[in-house]
């Protein structure tokens, strides 16, 4: 069975891993890094992903970051006159990770387990699955990030019974999950979170502070200057990381703007204490879901055996201190917060292929599910933190006499009124026979699969007529749209590959021109002048083809020149060997003469020892 890769599709960074020899291993990208920035840039019809895209973000307005924050919404980003959905941008990142995995494994990769924040709703999960399909991946399972982290942590500790709290603060989302580990079973008891809280917000408080300080000093608002803002973002992210290791950092941005007197520079010292003051409310916002998760699990902090920190933002000292204060436990530092989620996804991939045995994962739905009933009330059918997969049915009736149809309004959330919760979808059950209100019996059934994706059925128990939908949110893509995007993604991947091959061909041609010059110079006066002239002529023809940028001509001229250069190189080696042979013969003669002159024959007699 082919390998199933594990992918942590992050807000700021992504990571891919695979099971090898019973162990999950992170797959490095072509630059040798173990994580890849979740950044996509478009430049001259070329798509760039990762570090190369992030590096040119200051000068390229067609750079997209933190697209994960828009998953499951109808947000679109316009690039060079074309609109892209968050699923399409995420698919470009996934294609890049897929290519890294294929290069590492040396075989095609078609299946993946992709992680999502535990607090992702149905629309966000569907969008993630669609992104995988567009990237050419069969998404075998969607699993929650904290659960994946627990899988990676607990793989070697299956014989220990323990309750663990996973505190996952990533680039754009925050989750906390509480799990019980026992006999290879990883059971999630509760989960809570905030999908609008992460490392980006910590960067933002530094950016806001820098903008305010610069405005106070120079009366210029840098937030209105896109290029300056991107430089501020890069500086803020670097300062945040620096302050995890030192107590003070220097932020220096020369020529950030210009005033009447000339260029203006931003120079500022930021202390860890000031950063902690600026971000105090963000740290506090992580504690409320932590308390809620403990309450839902029916546990107190003292019942916990381990607290595991996941996500790059948990390196912030104030965050570590806050969770230590809240739980009374020193956070466990034995996992890499940037990689552990991808490793856990790879473990789940191994479970699905049978490479990992004796592991059972029981996850929960993060939000309650239900329908709108009379008076705009939200009636829950499945409570949050219910173990999935699960199914639940309830019988409802009509609200008016002779009502011919019922509208089923499917919602997800915790508020008592329907209007305050997230709409997942609507559908209609029609052809209900005329009857007084309250008589028809309409059975509504909710199914949640192992990916946390919802299916809803409504059935008239009198006629057995049934209507069913898989939830499609306003951002949900139809099969036709996904197919179209898959074809576009494949075409773009082919175009990217072709562009790469073109660049490689030009590089090889340039290298050959340089090599020819060197060979011709080395052979000057050593071979027939006609042969040198032939090589020079072929080299000039190749240079002309390179300047014309005619790829077919470059290929043909390169092949022709390569053959000539090979023949000349053979002659060069033959001459070198002939010269070496002559030198050796000369040396041997000299040695023979030396022997006759200097060697003296000596007499010796055997001395026998007395016995």
Curated annotation (Swiss-Prot):
UniProt-recorded Gene Ontology molecular function terms: ATP binding; ATP-dependent protein folding chaperone; unfolded protein binding
Gene3D superfamilies, per the entry: 1.20.1270.10, 3.30.420.40, Actin, Chain A, domain 4, Substrate Binding Domain Of DNAk, Chain A, domain 1
Bias type Acidic residues, positions: 600-611
Disordered: annotated segments: 581-611
InterPro entries: ATPase_NBD, Chaperone_DnaK, Heat_shock_70_CS, HSP70_C_sf, HSP70_peptide-bd_sf, Hsp_70_fam
Low complexity bias locations: 581-594
Induction: By stress conditions e.g. heat shock.
Pfam families (alphabetical): HSP70
Modified residues (Phosphothreonine): 173
Transmembrane segments: none
Sorted UniProt keywords: ATP-binding, Chaperone, Nucleotide-binding, Phosphoprotein, Stress response
Protein origin, superkingdom: Bacteria
Role, per record: Acts as a chaperone.
HAMAP family: DnaK
Similarity annotation: Belongs to the heat shock protein 70 family.
Xref: NCBIfam families: PRK00290.1 (NF001413), prok_dnaK (TIGR02350)
Protein name, entry field: Chaperone protein DnaK
Source species: Bacillus cytotoxicus (strain DSM 22905 / CIP 110041 / 391-98 / NVH 391-98)
């Amino acid at each position: 069975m082919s390998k199933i890769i594990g992918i942590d599709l992050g807000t700021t960074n992504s990571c891919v891993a695979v099971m090898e020899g019973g162990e999950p291993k992170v797959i490095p990208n072509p630059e040798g890094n173990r994580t890849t920035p979740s950044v996509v840039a478009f430049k001259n019809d070329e798509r760039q992903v990762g570090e190369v895209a992030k590096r040119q973000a200051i000068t390229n307005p067609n750079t997209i970051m933190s697209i994960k924050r828009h998953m499951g919404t109808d947000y679109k980003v316009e690039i060079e006159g074309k609109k892209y959905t968050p699923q399409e941008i995420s698919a470009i990142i996934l294609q890049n990770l897929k290519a890294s995995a294929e290069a590492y494994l040396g075989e095609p990769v078609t299946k993946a387990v992709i992680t999502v924040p535990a607090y992702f709703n149905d629309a966000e999960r569907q969008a993630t699955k669609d992104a995988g399909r567009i990237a050419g991946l069969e998404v075998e399972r969607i699993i929650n990030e904290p659960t994946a982290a627990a899988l990676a942590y607990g793989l070697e500790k299956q014989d220990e019974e323990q309750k663990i709290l996973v505190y996952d603060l990533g680039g754009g989302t925050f989750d906390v999950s509480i799990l019980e580990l026992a006999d290879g079973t990883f059971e999630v008891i509760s989960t809570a979170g905030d999908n609008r809280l992460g490392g980006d917000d910590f960067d933002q408080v530094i950016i806001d502070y820098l903008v305010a300080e610069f405005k106070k000093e120079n009366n210029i608002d840098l937030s209105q200057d896109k290029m300056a803002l991107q430089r501020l973002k890069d500086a803020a992210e670097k300062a945040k990381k620096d302050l995890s290791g030192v107590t003070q950092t220097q932020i220096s941005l020369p020529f950030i703007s210009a005033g009447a007197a000339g260029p203006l520079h931003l120079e500022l010292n930021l202390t860890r204490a000031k950063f902690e003051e600026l971000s105090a409310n963000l740290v506090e916002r992580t504690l409320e879901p932590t308390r809620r998760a403990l309450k839902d699990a029916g546990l107190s902090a003292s019942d916990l055996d381990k607290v595991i920190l996941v996500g790059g933002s948990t390196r912030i000292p104030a965050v570590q201190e806050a969770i230590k204060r809240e739980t009374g436990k020193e956070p466990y530092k034995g996992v890499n917060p940037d990689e552990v989620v991808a490793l856990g996804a790879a473990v789940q991939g191994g479970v699905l292929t049978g490479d990992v045995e004796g592991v059972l994962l029981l996850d929960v739905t993060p939000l309650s599910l239900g329908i709108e009933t009379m008076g705009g009330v939200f009636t829950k059918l499945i409570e949050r933190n219910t173990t999935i997969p699960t199914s639940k049915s309830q019988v409802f009736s009509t609200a008016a006499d002779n009502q011919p149809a019922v509208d089923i309004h499917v919602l997800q959330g915790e508020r008592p009124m329907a209007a305050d919760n997230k709409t997942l979808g609507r559908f209609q059950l029609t052809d209900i026979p005329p009857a007084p209100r309250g008589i028809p019996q309409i059975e509504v059934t909710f199914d949640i699969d192992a990916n946390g994706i919802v299916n809803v059925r409504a059935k008239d128990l009198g006629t057995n007529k049934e209507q069913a939908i898989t939830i499609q949110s306003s951002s949900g893509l139809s099969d036709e749209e996904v197919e179209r995007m898959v074809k576009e993604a494949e075409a773009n991947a082919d175009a990217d590959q072709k562009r790469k091959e073109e660049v490689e061909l030009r590089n090889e041609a340039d290298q050959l021109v340089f090599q020819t010059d060197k060979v011709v110079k080395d052979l000057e006066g050593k071979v027939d002048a006609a042969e040198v002239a032939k090589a020079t002529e072929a080299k000039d023809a190749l240079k002309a083809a390179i300047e014309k940028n005619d790829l077919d001509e470059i290929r043909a001229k390169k092949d022709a020149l390569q053959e000539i250069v090979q023949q000349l190189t053979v002659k060069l080696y033959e001459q070198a060997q002939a010269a070496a042979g002559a030198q050796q013969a000369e040396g041997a003669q000299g040695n023979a003469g030396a022997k006759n002159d200097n060697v003296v024959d000596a007499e010796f007699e055997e001395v026998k020892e007395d016995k």
